[in-house]
């Protein structure tokens, strides 16, 4: 009985508040902008490459594990808070669990198991996603600079002359990447500015064209600071680092125009460092390269900064 003579339990208001909080959380969850088709993807974009479903599956598994862990931890916290809070009528010392070896072992082993499982799946998928053993059908040198993008299409195109393996503008790219370049690839390029817009969609930034169903290798270089190359529906991004060359491969399997952006804060106009990716048929892709050559955009724009300092010793052009 409470001091004022009422027999109303003090726990009832707490339970009522908890029920109200759970109801509000359910309303907020159902009021999001996601459709029922988006829920299995947890709000992530629809994959448009052969590699993207692996990334989506990794994220789904990680979020499911995090949610299960969170529900367990939150449940224990709420359970202890609601049902084991200090009594107003009894003063007693709660049971002590110090030096309880089974409980302490459980606290240690369970987190280790969770981390080990997450590490295994992450390492397994990362090794597959970054595997460059397959020879690419198309190679594109993506050049990041403040504050736009350049795209060097390393291809044999009618009207272009030169050799990508010896071109001075590509000197910053290590030889281990040049080995996969086509022989005598004169190449064509496209380059944007922060004010560039796609004439068809009016989306900001230059447009990178890719052929559907072909393995595309991106060789990422920077002229100035660290950028990050992110095509949103690819579900993958990679840093573009001055003095260090990164690379990954994808196989687009869906035609369309997709948005890309720099995902690394790189200066005042970082927010304008946008681009588009247009996936088309292989025939339309080849025609686009010929159109660039007719415009006089043959050869290559400077790829970036040559590797220096300890990076030069670790990964040189002679590898």
UniProtKB/Swiss-Prot annotation:
Protein name: Probable cytochrome c oxidase subunit 2
Compartment annotation: Cell membrane
GO molecular-function terms, A-Z: copper ion binding; cytochrome-c oxidase activity
Record-stated family: Belongs to the cytochrome c oxidase subunit 2 family.
Top-level taxon of the source organism: Bacteria
Tagged with keyword Electron transport: yes
A Gene Ontology term for the protein's cellular component: plasma membrane
Signal sequence region: 1-33
InterPro entries: CcO_II, CcO_II-like_C, Copper_CuA, Cupredoxin, Cyt_c_oxidase_su2, Cyt_c_oxidase_su2_TM_sf
Gene assigned in the entry: ctaC
Keywords, in A-Z order: Cell membrane, Copper, Electron transport, Membrane, Metal-binding, Respiratory chain, Signal, Translocase, Transmembrane, Transmembrane helix, Transport
Function: Subunits I and II form the functional core of the enzyme complex. Electrons originating in cytochrome c are transferred via heme a and Cu(A) to the binuclear center formed by heme a3 and Cu(B).
Transmembrane portions of the chain: 63-83, 101-121
Its EC number(s): 7.1.1.9
Cofactor note (record): Binds a copper A center.
Catalytic activity: 4 Fe(II)-[cytochrome c] + O2 + 8 H(+)(in) = 4 Fe(III)-[cytochrome c] + 2 H2O + 4 H(+)(out)
Source species of the chain: Streptomyces avermitilis (strain ATCC 31267 / DSM 46492 / JCM 5070 / NBRC 14893 / NCIMB 12804 / NRRL 8165 / MA-4680)
Cofactor(s) the protein requires to work: Cu cation; heme
Bilayer topology annotation: Multi-pass membrane protein
GO terms classed as biological process: ATP synthesis coupled electron transport
């Amino acid at each position: 009985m409470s001091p004022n003579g009422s027999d109303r339990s003090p726990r009832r208001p707490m339970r009522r508040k908890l029920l109200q909080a759970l109801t509000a959380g359910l309303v907020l969850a159902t009021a999001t902008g996601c459709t029922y088709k988006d829920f299995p993807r947890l709000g992530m974009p629809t994959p448009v490459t052969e590699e993207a479903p692996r990334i989506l599956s990794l994220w789904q598994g990680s979020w499911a594990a995090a949610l299960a862990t969170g529900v367990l931890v939150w449940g224990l916290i709420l359970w202890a808070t609601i049902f084991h809070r200090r009594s107003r009528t009894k003063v007693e010392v709660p049971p002590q669990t110090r030096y309880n070896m089974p409980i302490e072992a459980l606290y240690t082993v369970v987190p280790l198991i969770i981390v080990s499982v997450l590490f295994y799946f992450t390492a397994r998928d990362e090794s597959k996603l970054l595997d460059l053993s397959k020879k690419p059908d198309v190679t594109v040198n993506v050049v990041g600079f403040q504050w736009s993008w350049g795209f060097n299409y390393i291809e044999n195109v009618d009207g272009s002359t030169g050799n990508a393996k010896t071109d001075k503008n590509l000197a910053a790219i290590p030889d281990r990447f040049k080995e996969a370049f086509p022989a005598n690839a004169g190449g064509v390029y496209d380059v944007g500015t922060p004010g560039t817009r796609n004439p068809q969609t009016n989306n900001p930034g230059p447009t990178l064209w890719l052929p559907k169903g072909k393995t595309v290798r991106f060789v990422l270089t920077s002229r100035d600071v660290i950028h990050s190359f992110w095509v949103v529906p690819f579900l993958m991004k990679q840093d573009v680092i001055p003095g260090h060359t990164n690379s990954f491969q994808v196989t687009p399997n869906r035609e369309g125009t997709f948005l890309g952006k720099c995902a690394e804060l790189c200066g005042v106009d970082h927010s304008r460092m946008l681009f588009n990716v247009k996936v088309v048929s292989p025939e339309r892709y080849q025609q686009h390269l010929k159109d660039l050559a007719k415009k006089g955009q043959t050869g290559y724009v400077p790829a970036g900064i040559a590797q220096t300092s300890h990076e030069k010793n670790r990964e040189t052009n002679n590898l």
